[in-house]
Amino acid sequence: EILTEELKVLQQRYQELMRKAKIAAGKTLLYKEPPYYITLGKELPAKALDEILTDSKEIYEELQEYYKKDTSFDKISVTFYEDTYSLYNLYRFAHYYEEAYGKYIWLKSGASLVIEHTEAMTVIDVNTGSVLKKKRQEDTLFYQINREAAKEIARQIRLRNISGIIMIDFINMKDEKQKEKLLLLLENECRKDRIHCNVVDMTALNLVEMTRSKVRRPLLEQITVCRKMQKN
């Protein structure tokens, strides 16, 4: 059913492009990919998006116009927000902005993740932090921390839309069975991702290499906080 609807949309788009091509002058732009905030509804999992709320009149009208032409967006409502209290403050965007951009991610155990982006890859380092000051039995503790980190790493990869090569530096473990269980856990967590992930292997130094397909630009490159929001 979903594929049928998608095919209808593509057929309509093709017919519209052919109609424009017959009457358009030379070097006329016939089609331009819609901005990210318009196509977001298709990229999210089913039922993940019920409403789009915006305080931009221009974006609101653009969304309304586009969604009228595409029946796949019928169940998504578009609302224009007119209150004097900004959406930025109402939904605590600063907090989520920091979570999506921050280099350091603190775990409940007291350990932390350090996420760094380079041109070649993304490197994620797992640090024990102050945990060792509280507990003993390092082997068991390191395994527990690595499990907690693996779950959060998979979540952060989805949240930040990190793609390409990803290197994860887990805390050193000696037990081979624990390493296998950790890899399996990471693979299972990555299966929650609608974008294809491939956990390659773990080296003797507890470095895990994985890849994630690139569907669109990472969140780091997408979000731009305007000066008006920053002042608020």
What residue ranges belong to the model's regions?
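OB-fold/S1-family RNA-binding modules
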Residues: 1-113, 118, 204-206, 211-214, ...
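Conserved glycine-centered short motifs in functionally critical loops
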Residues: 10, 109-232
